[in-house]
Amino acid sequence: MPGQKIETGHQDVVHDVAMDYYGKRLATASSDNTIKIIGVSNSGSQHLATLTGHQGPVWQVAWAHPKFGSLLASCSYDGKVVIWKEGNQNEWTQAHVFDDHKASVNSISWAPHELGLCLACGSSDGNISVFMARADGGWDKSRIDQAHPIGVTSVSWAPSTAPGALVGSGLLDPVQKLASGGCDNTVKVWKFDNGTWRLDCFPALSMHTDWVRDVAWAPNLGLPKSTIASASQDGKVIIWTAVKEGDQWDGKVLKDFGAPVWRVSWSLTGNILAVADGKNNVTLWKEAVDGEWQQVTTVEP
């Protein structure tokens, strides 16, 4: 589909855009404290709803898997995480508000749907919280205290199947792992084990020289290794790989972009990485047969 310009209707900076599972709706997050839901199609776009309730800039939005219904999560500078639920078409209500954090919540990530309805949240208070929906409508909470003591900037779930596992074999318990990035310039990997979160990388992954702005764990369908991309204020994107459970993570610089790198995002197949940098460029990268990363295209704005 050709590129099309979408007027969001926001009164301030747009920080995040998320497409729903079916590619029919966009959710946008803005410094005007609101979220907009926009219907998109080949013929254009239309404003469907404005979600109000946050008392500060909204940093990120994330759609839940549709098997849980029409749900959207948002996080804000106001320290709150809101789960929005669509009842009648385009009528959204706050189904749940989490106010456990004492500072800005900078990042949210839904777990793979195989793990249930489960949301991880990273905050400037240094903590990561994980909320798991129960059958009775309540939520269980677990927490990683002081994951990055001077602030968590990003969280991303691992795929629920271990690398190289036979998809659908049903023999393996789903994997519960998280990657996080922080203001301490590090990337950390966490594993949920016997009811608690434990650090799963020793030492922390520390090749960046400034804040880590984003982390993204790659889908690994049929791929033999685990891969995490990290983007930093230092201008670098680093690709971290671990061949099997318990292995050390190996880091390789994808590129020094010469400007802060804000976001990294994997294709659904896990073999193409999109990078958004501070020079307003979006570039796509693919790993060649020899293990080197090559730019495949630039996305024109």
Q: Where are the predicted features?
A:
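A short helix->beta-strand "capping" segment at the edge of beta-propeller domains
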Residues: 1-11, 44-46, 250-251
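WD40/WD-repeat beta-propeller blade N-cap
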Residues: 7-14, 51-58, 98-105, 145-152, ...
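WD40/WD-repeat beta-propeller blade-loop signature
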Residues: 13, 22, 47, 57, ...
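Loop/turn segments within WD40 beta-propeller blades
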Residues: 17-23, 62-69, 109-116, 156-175, ...
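Conserved strand-to-loop turn within each blade of WD40 beta-propeller repeats
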Residues: 29-32, 74-78, 121-125, 180-184, ...
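WD40-repeat beta-propellers
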Residues: 35-40, 61, 81-86, 128-133, ...
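Solenoidal tandem-repeat scaffolds enriched in leucines and small polar residues
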Residues: 96-190
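Terminal intrinsically disordered, low-complexity extensions flanking WD-repeat/beta-propeller proteins
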Residues: 163, 213, 223-226, 236-238, ...
